[in-house]
From Swiss-Prot:
The keyword Transferase applies. It comes from the Bacteria. It comes from Xanthomonas oryzae pv. oryzae (strain KACC10331 / KXO85). The modification N6-(pyridoxal phosphate)lysine is found at residue 243. This is 8-amino-7-oxononanoate synthase. InterPro entries: Aminotransferase_I/II_large, AON_synthase_class-II, AONS_Archaea/Proteobacteria, AONS_Proteobacteria, PyrdxlP-dep_Trfase, PyrdxlP-dep_Trfase_major, PyrdxlP-dep_Trfase_small. Pyridoxal 5'-phosphate binds at residues 111-112, 183, 211, 240. Its EC number is 2.3.1.47. Catalyzes the decarboxylative condensation of pimeloyl-[acyl-carrier protein] and L-alanine to produce 8-amino-7-oxononanoate (AON), [acyl-carrier protein], and carbon dioxide. One of its GO terms (biological process) is biotin biosynthetic process. Pathway: Cofactor biosynthesis; biotin biosynthesis. The gene is bioF. Belongs to the class-II pyridoxal-phosphate-dependent aminotransferase family. BioF subfamily. Homodimer.
């Protein structure tokens, strides 16, 4: 039998994506100014980034990056266990652990490899199992597959389903893993109830709080703290640095023994270059601002409420989210693509989320809010969405194949 030709396979997949009108396109950003983006020569007001606190362009953050780059250079030049672990890395780990109330922290290049590192290092036997919410981020799900352990999934937010899945796999070590804030829906996992399930089933509870830390909870400490939980209930927690903190990278916080084990055995940590010290210095400045500036979170709360009130008054279908992620359900993907295009014509950049990222018939506009938005910009967006809906409803839409 002839070996499959990879180029032929890729060509067939490309033709299918074109026929389905599902080709993914990268939009090139020329410049940024706060929440404004220059794309294709036009300035648009962005409601699509994860810069929830508006820290990515804050002058203290930029100054910290510039100063560290002048002192330490452009890169770490080695892995953490050779000579790439700088004072900046150590300080950032210590301050994030202290902020979140955890004994230890370990810095990773990004959240995807951090999730892989955790599962590969802890679930090393084929009888081990990772039980996950069906809507968890792809990095959590892919990490289980790559770790080689068993993956069992439960219906979204279904605590009893999580219990059933853990009971159904009693042989090996177990981890219960969940997003804290779900990135496409904006809702929050029932962390207290899940922590009880994990304890009853002798499973380690691991929470990915990529979208919560900095935004939710007391002093922005995230969903785990907001639920009144800590290291005793959630022994490991993922914090990403590229969303509310405006930079790049990820940190896993946890108890001393688990974090030490990751540092000594996690291949994605050991066999890669450490983050540039300048980037780490910028993130450290952002962490200090996030802890200090409660006004950023207060403004976000006001903007979220204003958006939801305005959208509800105009009859839009909202999802159960009190976070900066505010999806508007549009149904068919042809509708959401037309809505997104109409909004761009009106001067707004809003992400259109469609299958396979979300289920068929659940395409949506994914509006994300930042503390840098003004009430006037939020109202202008609502007005533009209403106009886009009216225009799109009168147009024949191209159906995907």
């Amino acid at each position: 039998m002839a070996r499959p030709d990879l180029h032929g396979r890729i060509s067939s997949l490309r033709k299918l994506h074109v026929a389905q009108d599902r080709v993914r396109v990268r939009r090139q950003v020329g410049r940024r100014d706060g929440v404004r983006l220059e794309i294709d020569g036009r300035w648009l007001t962005g409601f699509c980034s994860n810069d929830y606190l508006g820290l990515s362009q804050q002058f203290e953050v930029i100054a910290a990056l510039q100063d560290a780059a002048a002192r330490d250079g452009a890169g770490a030049t080695a892995s953490h266990l050779i000579c790439g672990h700088h004072t900046a890395h150590e300080t950032l780990e210590r301050e994030i652990a202290e902020w979140l109330g955890y004994p230890s922290a370990l810095l990773f290049g990004n959240g995807f490899i951090a999730n892989l590192a955790v599962q590969q290092a802890l679930l090393s036997e084929e009888d081990d199992v990772c039980v996950q919410d069906r809507l968890n981020h792809a990095s959590l799900l892919d990490a289980t597959r790559l770790a080689g352990c068993r993956l069992r999934r439960y219906p979204h937010l279904d605590v009893e389903g999580a219990m059933r899945q853990l009971k159904g796999a009693p042989e090996g070590a177990a981890m219960l893993a969940s997003d804290a804030v779900f990135s496409m829906d904006g809702d929050v996992a029932p962390l207290r109830a899940l922590s009880l399930v994990a304890r009853m089933q002798d499973a380690l509870f691991y929470v990915d709080d990529a979208h919560g830390v900095g935004v939710l909870g007391p002093q922005g400490r995230g969903c785990v703290a907001d639920a009144g939980l800590g290291v005793a209930e959630v022994p490991l927690q993922l914090v990403t640095l590229g969303k509310a903190l405006g930079g790049y990278g990820a940190v896993v916080v946890g108890d001393d023994a688990l974090v030490r084990h990751l540092a000594e055995t996690a291949r994605p940590y050991i066999y890669t270059t450490a983050l540039p010290p300048a980037q780490v210095a910028a993130t450290l400045a952002a962490v200090r601002l996030a802890r200090r500036d409660d006004w950023r979170r207060a403004r976000l709360v006001e903007l979220i409420a204003a958006f939801r009130d305005g959208a509800r008054k105009h009859g839009f279908e909202l999802m159960a989210s009190d976070t900066p992620i505010q999806p508007l359900l549009c149904g068919e993907e042809a509708t959401v693509m037309a809505m997104s295009a109409a909004l761009e014509q009106a001067g707004f950049m809003v992400g259109a989320i469609r299958p396979p990222t979300v289920p068929e018939g659940k395409a949506r506009l994914r509006v994300t809010l930042s503390a840098l938005h003004t009430p006037q910009q939020v109202q202008a967006l609502i007005d533009a969405i209403v106009q886009a809906r009216d225009v799109v409803s009168r147009q024949p839409l191209r159906a995907s194949a």
